[in-house]
Amino acid sequence: MTNSNFNHGNHGSNLPARLFTKQSQALIYNYKEAAVQRMLDFDNVSQRDTPSVGGLIHPGSDGGMYKAFFGFKELVIPVYNSVSEACQQCPNADVFLNFASHRSAYQSSLLALREPSIQTVVIIAEGVPENEARSLISIAKKLGKVIIGPATVGGIQAGCFKIGNTAGTIVYIMACKLYRSGSVGFVSKSGGLSNEMYNVLSRCTDGIYEGIAIGGDAFPGSTLTDHALRYEKLPEVQMIVILGELGGWDEYGIVEALKKGEITKPICAWVSGTVAKIFPTEVQFGHAGAKSGGETESADAKNKALREAGAVVPTSFEDFSNVIAATYAKLQSKGLVKPVEEPTPPELPLDFKTAVKAGKVRKPTSIISTICDDRGDELSYAGVPISEVCKEQYNMGDVIGLLWFKRKLPPYASKFFEMCLKLVADHGPCVSGAHNTIVAARAGKDLVSSLVSGLLTIGPRFGGAIDDSARVFQDAVDNNLQPSQFVEGMKSKGKRIPGIGHLIKSADEIDKRVVLLKDYAFTHFSSTKYLEYALEVEKYTLQKANNLILNVDGCIGVLFLDLLHSSGLFTQHEIKEIIDVGYLNGFFIVGRSVGLIGHALDQRRNKQGLYRHQADDVHYAL
């Protein structure tokens, strides 16, 4: 049957007989990591000397290098930010594998077609607009280039070159013996069915020489007929297997070629979609080109035409493997195919993640985490799903309880945490931390650098006395020291008492923050033993100087002791660990970070210039 509407793609066929060799290399656009590694794994079992991936293209990137494995060795693959740069730097790469979406596949494919070094363009995307597909086909024909796709999984030349994810995993490739060449040329519209057919052909014949999935869109860049005519020219191919589908006219091109004697090698063919005849109206079957339309486009009509033209066509798909096996057996009996010498493919090492999952290796971990888990579907804090944290409106005190103390704390405790954060958030621009942050911000440093500049001043003299005050006051109480004994003991050691004393606050000018903390504790804590002891110490130190008051660091430190001891949530061992590890200074660090960020932003917002200290405020003692 002849039809003027028959689409021959790059027809005549002007396609070169041989698309790939063991030296073929691909440039992969908008690359996918799994596809890159699968191609390289295929190279390894096929005993290629050079990797089939020449370069990767990540449009808009800064380039760089991508690491993958080539057998046991790690390979560094260059990453380029444009098609032209990649082609210039990789002149031996003649295949362009395009993983761009249907929205951008046209432009990137067009750029590749115009590069002299690129001979074959593979378009993976499904749903490329038909006018764009036709434009690419026309341009490719004028330039003498080959397009596979759109809407294709790609293709494979056994033991030679694999396109992207064709044939799936390395396990499947080994099972189908795709690591060495057979004598069957296979072409299909469907990528999924082509994978299944590789398995069938490995069992019924000596395997494929080459397999191509042209893609299921209405306008493929190259057709079933194009590739069948290619296989006719390849001396390694002894028989051709074709898997078509209803819709379109492509299969009639093969019918014409058979009738004209352009194809003389035996063809086994099947057109899927015979079930379409039970539907009264046109139905779409998956692919854009698979439509149950007119009678001549039906699977039954195509199968009949192919059979009448000389192709071996089964009565059903279930019988396809039998006719393939019978056809191959005839070739064997005529001596046209010789037994394949089975090579021993090199062993492919397991990826570490795969080996761990399979329980084949063990490895000591590098990090222990007991506070959160980001595996699975949802992040959790100390076992509490993040969705629950949001749904139940956990406050920052609750979150600190989970991530620092590994438990949900009672409301009075989490509110105390929040109160501490609020009270230490800022204490003006003149303190050392804020001053450093301001100087750094005015020097043009970024937000993180300005923040860190201020945080680095936190220590025993500024904001870092919470842990130390908790340690010394707990030791004094636990050893039953009288306040006077404690103070004089510290004095005799030549040490200041952490948490006692302030530069500007005094008994006459009290620190309102300390008042707020004391009031909260007396109202909500079941015991304030350590606070009461600290206040007795304060009475004694005030006899020595009016500014030797219990400051905010000291007050927070002793109140944490009261909270930890009276809550009933912590063991003595846990309390000791919390104080020894240094949890408590964390509250000052987190809280003060809010204020330091505020100062940095304030300076930048007000466009303050470089800070230089006044010379008259310096005593030059030379």
Swiss-Prot record:
Q: Where does ATP bind?
A: 228-248, 279-305
Family annotation (InterPro entries): Cit_synth/succinyl-CoA_lig_AS, Citrate_synth-like_lrg_a-sub, Citrate_synth-like_sm_a-sub, Citrate_synthase, Citrate_synthase_sf, Citrt_syn/SCS-alpha_CS, NAD(P)-bd_dom_sf, Succ-CoA_synthase_bsu_CS
> What keyword terms does UniProt attach to this protein?
ATP-binding, Cytoplasm, Lipid biosynthesis, Lipid metabolism, Magnesium, Metal-binding, Nucleotide-binding, Phosphoprotein, Transferase
Top-rank taxon of the source lineage equals Eukaryota
In terms of Pfam families, this protein maps to: Citrate_synt (PF00285), Ligase_CoA (PF00549)
Alphabetically, the GO molecular function entries are:
ATP binding; ATP citrate synthase activity; metal ion binding
Where does the protein end up? Cytoplasm
Catalysed reactions listed for this entry: oxaloacetate + acetyl-CoA + ADP + phosphate = citrate + ATP + CoA
- Could you give a single Gene Ontology term from the biological process aspect? acetyl-CoA biosynthetic process
What class does this enzyme belong to in the EC scheme? transferase
Q: Quick check: keyword Manganese in the entry? A: no
Record-level GO cellular component terms: cytosol; phagocytic vesicle
Query: Where, by residue number, does Mg(2+) bind?
Result: E245
Its job: Catalyzes the cleavage of citrate into oxaloacetate and acetyl-CoA, the latter serving as common substrate in multiple biochemical reactions in protein, carbohydrate and lipid metabolism.
Which family, according to UniProt? Answer: In the N-terminal section; belongs to the succinate/malate CoA ligase beta subunit family.
The name on file for this protein is Probable ATP-citrate synthase
Source species: Dictyostelium discoideum (Social amoeba)
Which gene produces this protein? acly
